[in-house]
Design a protein with these regions (language model features):
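Hinge/lid segment of periplasmic solute-binding proteins
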Residues: 96-152, 170-175, 288-291
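Extracytoplasmic/periplasmic solute-binding protein
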Residues: 138-153, 171-223, 266
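Glycine-centered hinge/linker elements that transmit conformational signals in sensory
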Residues: 175-178, 220-251
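A structural signal for short loop-to-beta-strand junctions that line the ligand-binding cleft
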Residues: 89-90, 118-161, 192-193, 298-304, ...
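Conserved C-terminal helix/tail region of periplasmic/extracytoplasmic solute-binding proteins
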Residues: 375-446
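Extracytoplasmic/periplasmic substrate-recognition and gating elements
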Residues: 137-140, 232, 240-249, 281-347, ...
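A structural signal for multi-pass alpha-helical bundles of membrane permease subunits
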Residues: 468-665
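Long, aromatic- and glycine/proline-rich binding clefts that accommodate carbohydrate-like moieties
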Residues: 126-131, 342-394, 398
Length: 665
């Protein structure tokens, strides 16, 4: 077919122009000014934020503000990856615990030029986060401006269920026991006395401080202090709430605790100020926020971590983008906007001029929040805090699952924290092997080009002959290159480098040291064994079930179209939705799996998500469910391509069904 008109005018220039238009017409905002904000706000907070952004857009019609919600880890890792590539949002909003890492990496910039000392005086000291410059440690930089202070935990009580206020931990336990109800005697509680996200280390901090423990040594340094008698006592108390008093559901994460309290199935919840607005406005019950009680055995108050939530500026922003972004920050931290957030969400303001408002004295929630904040401890804004959380989580969750004692968990936390912090601050310098690898990469590339020179020559010749064809497949090639080939090669290079918290931008090739360290890890072989088991089991069941179902559907089965649709659903549904569904089914208290086990099989319920072996088994079952439909579709397509004459000839020759399957199928 010739690309020409009847009059001989070639259409190729027109086609090229059309393709270029289609490729670049969706390139985004071509005009105006754009500010991108990544945040971690709850739905209630987002509603208030959008209202304030609309007001800002009305005042600045030439500026477009795009606010995107990100989960905690998604924001942290996504911002790091974007910053490494020289991109990312102009602004990020969140708690101050990530700032130590971001500043050490050198991916956020000093906000002092837009907040001079005269403006800084308008804020309470805790609202402004200053950290040493990554370039000159003798100089400090303003890396976050907070629009609120606190971000702390407190106790919220459902007053329709509980009229008392616990002042001590013994009183809290007594009330929780009284409010924990199993109405039908089936062993499953319809209501709990106390719920909170006790599987995460951040939410156990009030129990640590109430027993006199802390995560770092009291000398102000960065040495962890996780293995102390006080910490063991705190973990013991949490474990007793679960196992002895049974007032909290097993594996109670944030979503479970939040849902139970909102549905009136819990009398008390420990949660942060970001959630109180939802509870106080819940039409199903009357809620009240009160300070956490005093630990009876020590007389110390349960003090949560207190942190600032605020805005930070991306180092990769251009001067013009930075100026626009800081104009937005100045608006969102203004007294007018903070009053709106304070009134609707019960947050404590960061501007000094708002601390004398009658609302702070008259509103019981704000009074309780201020009192709770006084009892709390400031969150350390250091890069090592990330290592503390990551070191606490495995042993703490193993403790809750019953595989470790409190003393063992505390000891393992301390050892892992010391190791993680040492690795974090380790500086690996390139040696001769690293320099040789750097040059060998370029030599390999040059050798590949020389080796494939004839193929490249044929490609260039074919390009001149079939430019339009290559232009059609160019978008697919670009996508494959950017999403598969480049990330793979880039990660291979990074695995040979000293890229770390201390060498985030100035990393160099050091050789195979990272691989050697992995092989030296004691856990390496256990993880390798699990990987082999995972691969073998999934492969057997994916192929086995897939082939079996494909053979059945390929035969004379009535309603095969309906069966095919039903069996393809696990593969068609997004994996994220499937994971959430199975997670709910494996829940210890309310999951369908345990309901079948206990009520129909009369066997004890299994803590699927609380123990390593059971959790691994649950993951395998979920992945089998996800994977077999794909193999079924592939096999069914192959079966339908086999000529039926082969089976007819085999039957004439007297071949059995197994022989037909083995020799033909």
């Amino acid at each position: 077919m010739s690309l020409s008109t009847n009059h001989g005018t070639p259409l190729r220039p027109f086609v090229y122009t059309l393709l270029l238009f289609l490729l670049f017409s969706c390139s985004g905002d071509s005009g105006g000014k754009l500010i991108v904000l990544w945040h971690q706000m709850t739905p209630a907070e987002r509603a208030v934020l959008e209202g304030q952004l609309d007001a800002f857009r009305f005042k600045h019609p030439d500026i477009t503000v795009r606010a995107l919600y990100k989960e905690t880890e998604e924001l942290r890792s996504g911002f790091q990856a974007a910053a490494l590539a020289g991109a990312g949002p102009e602004l990020i909003y969140g708690p101050s615990d990530v700032l130590g890492s971001f500043q050490t990496m050198g991916i956020i910039q000093d906000m002092s030029p837009w907040f001079p000392p005269s403006e800084q005086e308008q804020f309470v000291p805790a609202a402004l986060t200053f950290l040493p410059s990554p370039v000159d440690s003798s100089r400090t930089e303003l890396v976050q401006v907070g629009d609120r202070i606190g971000n702390h935990l407190a106790l919220v009580i459902n007053r329709d269920l509980l009229s008392e206020t616990p002042l001590t931990s013994d009183e809290m336990i007594r009330m929780a026991v009284e409010q924990t109800v199993d109405e039908d005697g089936d062993g499953r509680n319809e209501r709990y006395g106390l719920v909170w996200n006790f599987v995460e280390p951040f939410f156990v901090i009030p129990f640590l401080t109430g027993h006199g423990a802390w995560i770092f040594k009291e000398d102000g340094g960065i040495e962890p202090d996780l293995d102390t008698p006080e910490a063991v006592a705190a973990y013991t108390m949490v474990l007793e709430l679960q196992d002895r008093w049974k007032v909290i559901p097993a594996n109670c994460d944030y979503e479970t605790a939040d849902a139970l309290f909102k549905n009136g199935q819990a009398a008390m919840i420990i949660n942060g100020d970001w959630s109180w607005g939802d509870y106080l406005s819940n039409p199903g019950f009357h809620a009240e926020v009160v300070p956490l009680p005093v630990i009876s055995s020590t007389g110390l108050p349960m003090g949560p971590m207190v942190a600032t939530k605020g805005y930070s500026l991306n180092l990769n922003s251009t001067p013009e983008e930075s100026a626009l972004a800081m104009e937005l920050v100045q608006y969102l931290t203004s007294a007018e906007v903070q009053i709106t957030f304070m009134g609707q969400l019960k947050t404590l303001p960061s501007r000094k001029s708002l601390l004398d408002l009658p609302m702070l004295r008259e509103d019981p929630t704000l009074r309780a929040s201020a009192e709770q904040m006084k009892r709390g401890r400031a969150m350390p804004v250091v890069a090592e805090l990330r290592a503390i959380w990551d070191s606490m989580r495995p042993s703490y969750q193993a403790l809750l699952g019953g595989s470790k004692t409190p003393a063992q968990a505390a000891h393992d936390m301390q050892e892992m924290a010391l190791t993680s912090i040492a690795k974090m601050n380790q500086r690996q310098e390139p040696g001769p092997v690293g320099r040789a690898l750097s040059w060998s990469g370029w030599l390999l590339l040059a050798g590949f080009i020389v080796w494939q020179r004839k193929t490249l020559g044929r490609f260039l010749h074919d390009w001149r002959e079939n430019r339009l064809s290559y232009l059609f497949i160019l978008p697919s090639l670009v996508v494959i290159l950017l999403t598969i080939v480049f990330p793979f090669l880039y990660n291979v290079v990074l695995s040979l480098s000293n890229m770390s918290l201390r060498h985030f931008r100035d990393w160099e090739i050091i050789g195979f040291q990272n691989y050697l360290e992995v092989f030296r890890e004691a856990v390496f072989f256990s993880v390798l064994l699990k990987t082999v088991i995972w691969t073998v089991v999934n492969l057997v069941f994916h192929v086995g079930l897939g082939v079996l179902l494909a053979v059945m559907l390929n035969g004379p089965v009535k309603g095969k179209s309906l069966y095919r649709v039903l069996l393809i659903i696990p593969w068609a549904v997004p994996a994220y939705i499937t994971a959430l569904t199975w997670r709910g089914m494996f829940d210890y208290e309310y999951g369908a799996i345990n309901l079948v086990i206990s009520q129909f099989l009369h066997m004890p319920m299994v803590n699927w998500l609380g123990s390593p072996f059971e959790a691994f088994l649950a993951c395998i079952l979920t992945n089998i469910w996800l994977g077999f439909p794909f193999m079924m579709v592939i096999t069914l397509g192959g079966l339908q391509g086999i000529p039926q004459e082969l089976y007819e000839a085999a039957r004439v020759d007297g071949a059995s069904r197994w022989a037909q399957f083995r020799l033909i199928t």
